[in-house]
Design a protein with these regions (language model features):
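Short S/T/G/P-rich N-terminal loop/turn motif that feeds into the first structured element of a domain
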Residues: 1-52, 56-75, 79-101
Length: 101
């Protein structure tokens, strides 16, 4: 069963923008998450100065095996994004409009 991770972030840098975060995600962090075993990852504009990253892994085991690397990416990302991690949670995907393998 797929495992979904959701992190929410708040921009704290004075010069960073959501476009800056988007560029970093596309260039560096999406490829990094996929290399760690993620099936898919998305960046979402949550509101004003906040954004969320939603990542789908094939299973909890795949995510758990990569958790140390994911933590390092989050720390590095916080600095590069000019944002602070507000919350991180995850769980088994129970249903989806898209077929999950």
């Amino acid at each position: 069963m797929s495992f979904v991770s959701i992190t929410t972030w708040r921009m704290i840098g004075e010069t960073e923008t959501l476009q800056h975060v988007t560029d970093l995600m596309v260039r560096k962090y999406f490829p990094g998450l996929l290399a760690l075993g993620a099936k898919h990852s998305m960046l979402m504009d949550a509101e004003l100065d906040r954004f969320a990253i939603v990542t789908v892994y094939p299973s909890r085991e795949v995510r758990d095996d990569a958790v140390a690397h994911i933590s390092a990416l989050r720390s590095e990302g916080a600095e590069e994004f000019g944002a602070e991690l507000m919350d991180a949670f995850g769980g088994e995907m129970l249903a989806s409009s898209k077929a999950c393998v």
